[in-house]
């Protein structure tokens, strides 16, 4: 008898306390990049009942109205009344931002931004070291069209749809806080076979019954998403649905649980399908390799899979603070390489095609733009948005050519 292999992943809505904090931190980052693309930003946000605290280190030529950014973000998410636990107009906002340490800055910015046009690109790439040490991972798999693991892809789509039907009124009685989780059964060849369980926990008004909520979510959220994403490729005609398993979920957001930037790093990435170096993304400008190198590693992995060189890939890259060149690059293909191609050849092709120095990553992926607010909910990867440049498969042909020279 074949062993049943079940793999799960979760996502959260934009109204989850930790995700509120991520979105605030990235909204502040975007505002600073909009005024000064070379801003160095490391902003954290914490949340508790009726209160936000924004703190961290910033070096920027611009000025950001932090109070307004916090309130605008909270309002956009949907927290507009103390009745649901948080009011954007009356919540408290404390701000404690200081300048970036000059010792950190000296290893990152050896060329002043005003002089960048006076030096060659190669000089600039060599001059900008990594903003910190660390290990970053990127992953791609051909089990979905967007080359993401199916459990996290479905969980994100369900979370997004849950927020969508709340905002457009398609499902009444919903409030902003919510979580989703999907369990997929895989076959002996590690291909998705069927949906086993869909779990949704969502904040709601007190007058709705759990039975009515369950039926509405199944009709307007679960079934449309499964049909659209899966079609006939993965069975989804007999799965378990769990909605608010503990009962009512009336009080949510920071009124129920404290929130903090960077506490949903597995939700933000691959749902547990790949390793994680531990560094969060939100609130960090692209000089921080926690963010930019993780984006680049996804870009590398996705291009490898899109080129047909492997079915599943994890890319690891590591840096030393103040040093431009990665201290290591490793490509793991889990034995899924294309016929006639070795893992070592793929790794060598990656070194030939991709420049993973921090300044080169920033240039290649155009990361100095104010694009980060929309990354802060529903996943940083697997999104079909032109601003998510790390999702572009623009290196496929170069990889194929590089492999051809190595195989021959």
Swiss-Prot record:
UniProt-annotated binding residues for ATP: 16, 177-179, 257, 263-264, 280, 284
Record's keyword terms, sorted: ATP-binding, Cytoplasm, Magnesium, Metal-binding, Nucleotide-binding, One-carbon metabolism, Potassium, Transferase
Reaction catalysed by this enzyme: L-methionine + ATP + H2O = S-adenosyl-L-methionine + phosphate + diphosphate
Record GO cellular component, one term: cytoplasm
Cofactor: Mg(2+); K(+)
Free-text function comment from the UniProt entry: Catalyzes the formation of S-adenosylmethionine (AdoMet) from methionine and ATP. The overall synthetic reaction is composed of two sequential steps, AdoMet formation and the subsequent tripolyphosphate hydrolysis which occurs prior to release of AdoMet from the enzyme.
Subunit description: Homotetramer; dimer of dimers.
HAMAP family with a match to the protein in the record: S_AdoMet_synth1 (MF_00086)
Name by which UniProt lists this protein: S-adenosylmethionine synthase
Species, as recorded: Bifidobacterium animalis subsp. lactis (strain AD011)
Taxonomic classification: Bacteria, Bacillati, Actinomycetota, Actinomycetes, Bifidobacteriales
